[in-house]
Amino acid sequence: MSRPLRPTSSSPWDCSGGVFDWDVALRKLDELNARVEDPTLWDRPSEAQAVSRERANLAAKVEAVQSIERDLKDALEYAELAEMESDEDSLNDARAQLKSLKERAGRAELEALLSGEADGNDCYVEINSGAGGTESCDWAGILLRMYTRWANAHGMTTELIEETDGDQAGIKSATLLVKGANAYGWLKTEAGVHRLVRISPYDSSARRHTSFASAWVYPVVDDNIEIEINPSDVRTDTYRASGAGGQHINKTDSAVRLTHIPTGIAVACQAGRSQHQNREEAWKMLRARLYEAELQKREAAQQALEDQKTDIGWGHQIRSYVLQPYQMVKDLRTNVETSDTQGVLDGDLDAFMAASLAQRVGHTRDGGEAS
């Protein structure tokens, strides 16, 4: 395999010395290419899959940078030619190309910052309603829809693993499995409490209500990562799955809840048709939860997740969504805000995620209007 060319020193995408060091990335890609081409690697299937996945992820980042540089060179040549010929239409086309390239470069830069141990993994998004009763249950349902739409817009797939309906509307809780490139790396920035202010559709007096719901995000654990769980530390409960009914409604105790007694971490699954399927998925979820807890300790990125969960209310907010008396979504960590509330609720979260990700890796940016 040929070694990719290094961008020129005059390239506007010079990452040397940053989180994505170009020379280090090329050396690492050479090493991974050599390992993939070593036939003895495939005697160890789990390791081979992990190496192949790491190589594909890094190769995609390198190609993204090189593609931007190639297109930038072409756009600049086109602009120079248009300027020499005083062709205003072509100049406008060149400006549009350069604007698009700037956006691509920004996205590629952020993708390069997804260098955490589990950033490339699929993930679970666990949503829970908080203070506010029916209003909060409805709000939790809106968040579930928001993240589903975000994932679908980015070519990811989703699967509803568990859902508990609210008494009157919305959901009390739900767990969404999101599968796609860097799913955990992006969605981990959404972990925290989300606050909604609106005129309640459930209040006959049309009063303004404040509601809370939380989103907690855990990486799906790769098969080659060993998470040791003593079966005697896990309590298993079964119960009847809830749902909308119909011919496929489950009339047996097929839903499964696992509780890890030492940590108090609990997971539940009711998506499968059988108790066996739900038990298997619940164990995957429990491994993911315990892995996330270990990552937090190792990276010292934030206090233990279960400590944060004690109060789904004012104390741990990351974002505020105001629909009345004015319309504004504001991230309380980065100060990024937008008045396009409907767009955000329809899954347009990239500006918030990008700012939070940049802040996490030490590339703090000024807060501003979300585009």
Swiss-Prot record:
Q: Please provide one cellular component term from the Gene Ontology annotations of this protein.
A: cytoplasm
UniProt keyword Phosphoprotein, yes or no: no
In terms of InterPro entries, this protein maps to: PCRF, Pep_chain_release_fac_I, Pep_chain_release_fac_I_sf, PrfB
| PTM comment | Methylated by PrmC. Methylation increases the termination efficiency of RF2.
Single GO MF descriptor: translation release factor activity, codon specific
Q: Per its UniProt record, what SUPFAM superfamilies does this chain match? A: Release factor (SSF75620)
| Sites bearing N5-methylglutamine, chain numbering | 247
The protein's location, in the record's own words, is:
Cytoplasm
Highest taxon above the source species: Bacteria
Sorted UniProt keywords: Cytoplasm, Methylation, Protein biosynthesis
> Transmembrane ranges?
none
Q: Which Pfam families match?
A: PCRF, RF-1
In terms of one coarse class, where is the protein primarily found? Answer: cytoplasm
Q: What does this protein do?
A: Peptide chain release factor 2 directs the termination of translation in response to the peptide chain termination codons UGA and UAA.
Q: Which family does it belong to?
A: Belongs to the prokaryotic/mitochondrial release factor family.
Q: What is this protein called?
A: Peptide chain release factor 2
Q: Which organism is it from?
A: Caulobacter vibrioides (strain NA1000 / CB15N) (Caulobacter crescentus)
What is this organism's lineage?
Bacteria, Pseudomonadati, Pseudomonadota, Alphaproteobacteria, Caulobacterales
